[in-house]
Amino acid sequence: MAFEALTGINGDLITRSWSASKQAYLTERYHKEEAGAVVIFAFQPSFSEKDFFDPDNKSSFGEIKLNRVQFPCMRKIGKGDVATVNEAFLKNLEAIIDPRTSFQASVEMAVRSRKQIVFTGHSSGGATAILATVWYLEKYFIRNPNVYLEPRCVTFGAPLVGDSIFSHALGREKWSRFFVNFVSRFDIVPRIMLARKASVEETLPHVLAQLDPRKSSVQESEQRITEFYTRVMRDTSTVANQAVCELTGSAEAFLETLSSFLELSPYRPAGTFVFSTEKRLVAVNNSDAILQMLFYTSQASDEQEWSLIPFRSIRDHHSYEELVQSMGKKLFNHLDGENSIESTLNDLGVSTRGRQYVQAALEEEKKRVENQKKIIQVIEQERFLKKLAWIEDEYKPKCQAHKNGYYDSFKVSNEENDFKANVKRAELAGVFDEVLGLMKKCQLPDEFEGDIDWIKLATRYRRLVEPLDIANYHRHLKNEDTGPYMKRGRPTRYIYAQRGYEHYILKPNGMIAEDVFWNKVNGLNLGLQLEEIQETLKNSGSECGSCFWAEVEELKGKPYEEVEVRVKTLEGMLGEWITDGEVDDKEIFLEGSTFRKWWITLPKNHKSHSPLRDYMMDEITDT
């Protein structure tokens, strides 16, 4: 019951998943089983070297960036970094989801029938199952989580698939809970991707043949197996040690030197890992802790055991039948750092140092949670919301009463309220920059980046305060000294806030902000090729409503003929910005606003055909 509560899967589903995974060995690419309200898709594993490291991929670990259009959620929202996955595994998925195959139609049928879908596989078939689950989440589930059923992914001895961004994105979207990966203690396959391709390429073909359960039994005297195991674990050790040093901020000098000239594997665990021993099952859902355990659970207690482990690492890859059959007889532990982990890790053969590193990883996650709580406290203690409310409910209305709006009032800063607004602007920036620092250092839980309450607060802050930052930038003539605000002056806090909001509103449609923006621009019929328009709008403020004033400031001093495309783009975006609350129409059309004063200087022919002509009818009539 405890296992099901943690993972969302029961013993029967695990047994059926393993059974389907065995059947997948007999199929071309995948095997489908249907029983009651569940449909299981099991993927055939491959034990060919080219299906672990794509021959055309020249990188040290066979990795490739995911396609952002196909996998829009698999990235860090703020930084914009896209997740990396193993290219060979990705190509296998692409072949399976090709519309010419039966797979997509089978998934569509299961979706329409309102059946729960389980993706599963043994060995590299598990890698395909992981990517297929992400594909399903992006293509179906994210569009309407209240309609589409939650999928499950159950793997047995699967290799690692993606990098830390892959793991982070699953955590942010709260999808990690859908992935359960069973690992026999010494199984080498979940560790292979932590090794450099150059380290194992000579021995990999032979070892993969030994890993194939359809081939002959393991040769205990085979030197190539020992060599392969030693090289994989040597690289795994380097990765694990570097990771824990980065985690705790105690980087050892030799590791810093080593990492400067030696590439380390980008692959990291994702989801829940269930380690199995003779006595117990140990579930871990902390990626950093899992990485340490992948190394420290496979170590020997003495020299005699060490000589046997390389061959045990092959046999354990064949042991999942026994694991599944004995699950009901084993103790179950969830390694979350709350309870004593000594006995649990002892049973897994983890050394004292290993226990310290696993505990350190679990403690770091606790610190991330504490940091999130502190942010909430700071927002409350610093009267964050009251400061925003003062700008919104007092400062803005008073400025608007003077017919010039709060942007222009702040830019001039002649009144006492302008000084107060500047103080509050600086205080609010301090809070946001503190949060941003924690996000950049990965010192907040993965879920924080996608937290709806935080996104809404950051959006309110960006819309309200960024115009003041733009006004301040131009008041001090930084545009002349440093360059345009959009190119040189825009604080990262606003970029992160903008991207978080865009992800939040576009996610249900499986879209990315850049494509949406350029589709809108293309629909404005500006009379140029899209490539020319993209070059013209590079570093413009038309991609974000809170940057409206930055674009106005850049346009107002230039000849119309030089900036016609930018003017029309700004006008074309403005209506939707007003509707969405990005721009305050009560502000920008005021008699004394910088925008209105600039707009009336535009050529009469332009104004007569402008989408803003209804707002500016008196100006058109006067001119």
UniProtKB/Swiss-Prot annotation:
It is found in: Nucleus; Cytoplasm; Microsome. Changing residue 262 to P: Loss of interaction with PAD4, but no effect on dimerization or interaction with SAG101. Induction: Up-regulated by salicylic acid or upon turnip crinkle virus or avirulent bacterial pathogen infection. GO terms for biological process: aerenchyma formation; defense response to Gram-negative bacterium; leaf abscission; lipid metabolic process; plant-type hypersensitive response; regulation of hydrogen peroxide metabolic process; response to hypoxia; response to singlet oxygen. One of its GO terms (molecular function) is lipase activity. Residues 358-383 form a coiled coil. Keywords: Acetylation, Coiled coil, Cytoplasm, Endoplasmic reticulum, Hydrolase, Microsome, Nucleus, Plant defense. The active site is at residues 123, 187, 317. Pfam families: EDS1_EP (PF18117), Lipase_3 (PF01764). The keyword Transport does not apply. The keyword Acetylation applies. Disruption phenotype: No effect on RPS4-mediated resistance against avrRps4 bacteria, due to the redundancy with EDS1B. GO terms for cellular component: chloroplast; cytoplasm; cytosol; EDS1 disease-resistance complex; endoplasmic reticulum; nucleus. The modification N-acetylalanine is found at residue 2. Homodimer. Interacts with RPS4, RPS6, SNC1, SRFR1, AvrRps4 and HopA1. Part of a nuclear complex made of EDS1, PAD4 and SAG101, that can be redirected to the cytoplasm in the presence of an extranuclear form of EDS1. Interacts (via N-terminus) with PAD4 (via N-terminus). Interacts (via N-terminus) with SAG101. EDS1-SAG101 and EDS1-PAD4 form separate complexes in pathogen-unchallenged cells. Part of a nuclear protein complex made of VICTR, PAD4 and EDS1. Interacts with VICTR. Positive regulator of basal resistance and of effector-triggered immunity specifically mediated by TIR-NB-LRR (TNL) resistance proteins. Disruption by bacterial effector of EDS1-TIR-NB-LRR resistance protein interactions constitutes the first step in resistance activation. Acts redundantly with salicylic acid to regulate resistance gene-mediated signaling. Triggers early plant defenses and hypersensitive response independently of PAD4, and then recruits PAD4 to potentiate plant defenses through the accumulation of salicylic acid. This is Protein EDS1. It comes from Arabidopsis thaliana.
